[in-house]
Each structure stands twice: as C-alpha cells, then as structure tokens.
Amino acid sequence: MATYPSAKFMECLQYAAFKHRQQRRKDPQETPYVNHVINVSTILSVEACITDEGVLMAALLHDVVEDTDASFEDVEKLFGPDVCGLVREVTDDKSLEKQERKRLQIENAAKSSCRAKLIKLADKLDNLRDLQVNTPTGWTQERRDQYFVWAKKVVDNLRGTNANLELKLDEIFRQRGLL
C-alpha cells in the first residue's frame, strides 16, 4: 500500500520553501538552500526509514528560525508544539559567537532527544556529502578539513541513534582518515 505525504507535511514543505526562497548554499553553483532541508527530510525518510511525520516536518524546518525571519511562535502556531519543540532542540542560538555555537553543538548533541538526534545526523550527512564534492565559496582547504573534524565530534555524541545513518557517516569519516 502506498503512503502519501499529509496535507500538513505539504504545508510544512511549502512554508520552508517560502522562508528559504532568497537563500543559496555556499557551493559554487549557489544551489537553492531549500534543497538542503528537503535533502535532510528525505535522508530521514528514505535512508533512515523514519516514518514519524513530526521528525520529517522538523527536518524541513530545522534551519527556519536560525536562518530566516520565522520565529518559534510561528512554527508552533502553524505546525504544533511537537514540531516546534524539535525545531527548538536543533536550532543554534545566533546571538552567540560562531565558535561557541559549534562547541555547544558538540556538547549538547548527547543530551538531545532521540528524535532531534536523527535530524542532526541527517543534517550532518547532507552537509558532509555536499562538502565532499564542493568547497564552499570563500572556504580554504584547511577550513573544509576542520569542518569534517568538528562534524565527527558532533556525530560521536549522537551515536546509538540510527545505524543506517551512522554507517554512512562513518564511511565519509573513513574516507577522510578520521576513523
């Protein structure tokens, strides 16, 4: 029996596309940013076999508060407290310096809920896959290498969440000589 996305999921996808409409990835092709959030949700559904619609919707929205004018209140009003709670868990505090945010991602990864950990794993997997083939505009090779090292530290604190995603991440880390 085929399953179909719910109307709420499609509204969420449309909202994410609208909010990220002016944003581009830092790759040389300047890929529309919305592709990333779609990839994260797709990784969870297809590769991690996640059927929890709240997780899949929060994956679509995982950067919406951090990177657009959307607020947690907007997310809760439109998509409910469950999705909003997950978005809150995976959102960095942009008022902090970048290095502090990165440190907190490592530290807080282990304390996250299992559902938030899934989103973080899929987010890292998509970012690392992109980084394997594209050096972001303005990044040095050293900065790129440092991102892989940092991402491994985050992933190490997310372990035990989803074997499929962890195997795919480990494959990337192995290729980079980090395992």
Swiss-Prot record:
SMART domains xrefs: HDc (SM00471)
EC number per UniProt: 3.1.7.2
Catalytic activity field: guanosine 3',5'-bis(diphosphate) + H2O = GDP + diphosphate + H(+)
Keyword rRNA-binding part of the UniProt annotation: no
Phenotype reported upon loss of the gene: Induces retarded body growth and impaired starvation resistance. Mutants have highly down-regulated DNA and protein synthesis-related genes and up-regulated stress-responsible genes.
Requisite cofactors: Mn(2+)
Superkingdom, taxonomy of origin: Eukaryota
Any one GO MF annotation of this record: guanosine-3',5'-bis(diphosphate) 3'-diphosphatase activity
Pfam family, one: HD_4
Family of the protein in this entry: Belongs to the MESH1 family.
Job of this protein: ppGpp hydrolyzing enzyme involved in starvation response.
Protein's recorded name: Guanosine-3',5'-bis(diphosphate) 3'-pyrophosphohydrolase MESH1
Organism: Drosophila melanogaster
